[in-house]
């Protein structure tokens, strides 16, 4: 009887220690449903924004690193106008393109936010990864806001920090 209780207790301990993740969710939004023809939109201003992100960071020494989940958040800060994103390109630490997230321009409605998520196990970006975003907006509309949120949780420890994009053109 003691043995059965011990086995049941061990079983319940094992299943209670599993993560409560939602691994069946898509990591990146389906941008094809947001596709737009910019030729039909009148007089737009364009810009380009650089966003640094970190899929891996150093800890203690340069030989020890921690993997991070990256969320690149793209926000339309306008109360009334749509903004358009025509390029979302992910680059690694060496400045080489890793992935392009858009096949065609997409729209972001007023006050809407979309995200690109880089999974914690995806380490192609390295310690100095970045995004280049190209965007369009109406002349009197506020610029889109680009933020990176990096997070890692392991056991009872957690690490998170943010970066903000800078306009380069």
PLM regions: where:
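Intrinsically disordered, low-complexity Pro/Gly/Ser/Thr-rich segments with frequent PxxP/GP/PP motifs
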Residues: 93-130
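C-terminal motif of bacterial Sec signal peptides marking the signal peptidase cleavage site
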Residues: 13-16
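Asparagine-centered strand-capping/turn motif at beta-strand->loop junctions
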Residues: 74-81
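Terminal connector regions
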Residues: 22-30, 122-169
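Short, solvent-exposed loop/turn segments enriched in Ser/Thr/Gly
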Residues: 65-71
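Post-signal peptide N-terminal segment of mature Sec-exported envelope proteins
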Residues: 25-47
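Short, hydrophobic/aromatic beta-strand segments
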Residues: 81-88, 100, 143-147
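Sec-dependent signal peptide recognition
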Residues: 2-8
């Amino acid at each position: 009887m003691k043995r059965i209780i011990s086995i049941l207790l061990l079983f319940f301990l094992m299943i209670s220690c599993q993560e409560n993740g939602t691994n069946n969710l898509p990591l990146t939004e389906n941008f094809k449903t947001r596709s737009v023809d910019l030729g039909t939109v009148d007089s737009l201003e364009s810009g380009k924004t650089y966003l640094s992100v970190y899929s891996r960071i150093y800890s203690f020494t340069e030989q020890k690193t921690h993997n991070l989940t990256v969320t690149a958040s793209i926000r339309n800060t306008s109360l009334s106008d749509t903004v358009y994103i025509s390029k979302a390109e992910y680059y690694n630490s060496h400045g080489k393109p890793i992935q392009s997230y858009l096949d065609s321009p997409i729209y972001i409605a007023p006050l809407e936010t979309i995200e690109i998520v880089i999974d914690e196990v995806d380490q192609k970006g390295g310690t100095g990864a970045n995004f280049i975003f190209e965007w369009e907006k109406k002349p009197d509309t506020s610029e889109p806001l680009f933020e990176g949120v990096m997070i890692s949780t392991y056991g009872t420890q957690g690490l998170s920090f943010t970066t903000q994009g800078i306009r380069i053109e």
